[in-house]
Amino acid sequence: TGMQKVSFTENLDFSDKKMVTQILLETSFSKEIRILLRKGQLMKEHKAPFPIIVHMVEGNIDFGVEGTVHVLKQGDMITLAANIPHDLLAKSDTIVRLTLSKLDAAERVEKVVANS
């Protein structure tokens, strides 16, 4: 069929050691990735080669963009243009929905997590 259904809030597998990323959905135009962050976990500053969307499913983060911190809480959604430096610090256990362009690589996100 032309429909897919997934849940961002089921089968949560948080890790105290590192952030957990998982591609939950891939469409003809996007990749939907779930990022699980424990309170205090940091995703170091990085850039995306294509625009991204960050949707706060649960929790809250300090989202740094070019040196300015934006507080994002449950339900918030932001867009970010390509090549803008940004970082994330979890202020509580957090579920993030990251929407990537189909042209972007999920492996890139995994590398950022591994290096954070």
Where are these regions (language model features)?
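Conserved short histidine dyad/triad with adjacent acidic residue
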Residues: 18, 31-48
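Short, conserved beta-strand element in jelly-roll/cupin
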Residues: 36-38, 48-62
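A short, N-terminal "cap"/entry segment at the start of jelly-roll beta-barrel domains
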Residues: 1-29, 112-116
